[in-house]
UniProtKB/Swiss-Prot annotation:
It comes from Alkalilimnicola ehrlichii (strain ATCC BAA-1101 / DSM 17681 / MLHE-1). It holds the Pfam family GIDA_C_1st. NCBIfam families: mnmG_gidA. Signal peptide: none annotated. Keywords: Cytoplasm, FAD, Flavoprotein, NAD, tRNA processing. NAD(+) binds at residues 273-287. Homodimer. Heterotetramer of two MnmE and two MnmG subunits. Its main location: cytoplasm. It is found in: Cytoplasm. It comes from the Bacteria. This is tRNA uridine 5-carboxymethylaminomethyl modification enzyme MnmG. Belongs to the MnmG family. One of its GO terms (biological process) is tRNA methylation. NAD-binding protein involved in the addition of a carboxymethylaminomethyl (cmnm) group at the wobble position (U34) of certain tRNAs, forming tRNA-cmnm(5)s(2)U34.
Amino acid sequence: MDHPERFDVIVVGGGHAGTEAAMAAARIGARTLLLTHSIETVGQMSCNPAIGGIGKGHLVREIDALGGIMARAADRGGIQFRTLNSRKGPAVRATRAQADRQLYRQAIRRAVENQPRLALFQQSVDDLIVEGGRVTGVVTGMGLRFRAPAVVLTVGTFLGGRIHIGESNYGGGRAGDPAANALAARLRELPFQVDRLKTGTPPRLDGRTIDWARLTEQPGDDPAPVFSFLGRPDEHPAQVPCHIAHTRPETHDIIRGALDRSPMYSGTIEGVGPRYCPSIEDKVVRFADKGSHQIFLEPEGLDTHEVYPNGISTSLPFDVQYELVRSIPGLEQARIVRPGYAIEYDFFDPRGLHPTLETRHLEGLWFAGQINGTTGYEEAAAQGLLAGLNAALRVQGREPWYPRRDQAYLGVLVDDLITRGTREPYRMFTSRAEYRLMLREDNADLRLTPIGRDLGLVDDERWRRFNAKREALEREQARLAATLIRPGDLPDALARQVLGGPLRKEQRLEELLRRPDVGYADLMRLPGAGDPVPDAEVVEQLEIQARYAGYLERQHDEVARARRHEQLPLPEGLAYDRVAGLSSEVREKLAAHRPATVGQAARIPGVTPAAVSLLLVHLRRQGLLRESA
């Protein structure tokens, strides 16, 4: 039967991608339905209890700048906060929070349930309704049909999911949840290029059986940072430390002796695992010369004794897991409360997507999250926001939106996926962004909140707070640029103390702030400097923008040069076999990828600068060379 209600957007899956997709669609006015196999697991952290990290924290801040919910939930559920790379430049500094699983999930569910125009319904989805070459709805496991002109699939590891523990394996989307096998079979019938990936999780430990005195304590930062631009440190729950342990040669011997029982090495698992989060058996094999590997013992929450040993993800048999855990100093008496496992699942080649994350083969269908070959909560959530936004924009008859590589890490993520594809779970790093000095955590709001406001993603309170910060920043920048400090007004002793030496000539405060060892607080000690601004975020922006002004200017120039051709659109049906001078290899790659712009074409592996020049010549001759709006 058909459900009596009609929706604009249907989101399938209530994980990190699904919740952001549903929230984004509803925020801009679309009647949205979020379908999940269990309302109790909406917003669940299926793997490690943490948000953020290098590159990932940048995505969380961008989601927040666009009105998303991940950062707010992390602030309310975070039980340890740290700024990574704090001694390095601002481009690579990143926030990471250890989260209480229950508090985080509750924060997400609360946001979803209180969002206007967003309905929740508990049912798995077994089929898509396809009519006239486009998706028009879904069919649930009980045969109930929901209709909508836009459907977003955010199904995580559930498509054809198979869990492996040693020689045993069984169907599942994660431990305790069934796989979406019917939907996986249906998608395999459609014209998508499907493959398999693998990820894993470590055994969970009972913290009461760990000898904490033998481990190295790793405290959080004090004061603790926040993720959200609206967040405050006093919103954080109680803060707790993590601890560090180490494997030893005996641990590695146990693992090597059981490799023939590992599904990864016996050939049972065919999917490719994450390069940057390898299993412990992978680490022991790939880094055979290392006598020890770090393990981070992370608390799962404030009201549980369960501990997540980050660094020993494994699919080895339980008896081997038991032995290897107890070979680690400090864990000799540790009790395993949940076994580690690997999970293998379907994903679809993301080169079959538009930059909006709508599929090229079926109109009205968007993919977001692990279905596109990514790994990580943050990567999934960012894609979900973009997919849900564009699904709603389509229904409303509005122009699509997606960020460029120089605008956001989200732009880098999507461009990498749709241009280059992936053969292994894709993880975001700052090193993937060529314009990373412009794409910092601290300026995500300045980059994206005005865009989010125009799209309808940003509410009045966030917009008010953002404008207050932006106006304070602009006022103080103007004041620093206009305020002169003269040598005669500055005692030599104070000049040496603040500036490192006497002031030789008249200088503006703005110029003095560009000195590497001079901070804003130092400047405010100078006679005639005026009153300081109280907002720490404004001060941070003043220092970064002054200190890195020259580098930022050069990067802006690089962006301008690159954008001359970056946004030149390529006709969707362009016949690459008619472009004179292109090699067969380049023609095949362009035809397979179908890049939307010249910039995307240039980033396809194997497409040379010479090939791009030939492409531009062809477009010019055909009268197709026009600037994109």
